[in-house]
Amino acid sequence: MKPDEAHLLQALCEVRDPAEMRRVLSDLLTRSEAAALHKRWAILCLLRDGVPQREIARRIGGSLCNVTRGARLMRNPACASAALMDRL
């Protein structure tokens, strides 16, 4: 891992307040990047809830390819996003 990447990750780990995290992400991401991140998270959450892939694509307005990519990710036992969801 590059030192600047490690520094960014450490800084993000310091944020404890959702409102502060929103401000930090707003500083770091463009609106379209933030929207893409939100869409990816929403896809993973719906997959976790057992919503069928085609229904997710319809609800989210995304492509079935993106949903399928998320489903493949969620099937991976090493999926960090699934582990994070388990802690929420």
Language-model-derived ranges and their functions:
Residues 1-15:
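General nucleic-acid-binding
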Residues 20-39:
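Short, Lys/Arg-enriched anionic-surface-contact patches
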Residues 31-34, 45, 55:
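N-terminal helix-turn-helix DNA-binding core of bacterial DNA-binding proteins
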Residues 37-51:
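Short, amphipathic alpha-helical "recognition" segments used to contact nucleic acids or chromatin
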Residues 47-55, 87-88:
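Long, compositionally biased
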Residues 50, 63, 74-75:
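The DNA-recognition helices of helix-turn-helix-type DNA-binding domains
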Residues 55-61, 67:
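Short alpha-helical "recognition helix" segments of helix-turn-helix
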Residues 70-85:
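Short, solvent-exposed alpha-helical "recognition" segments
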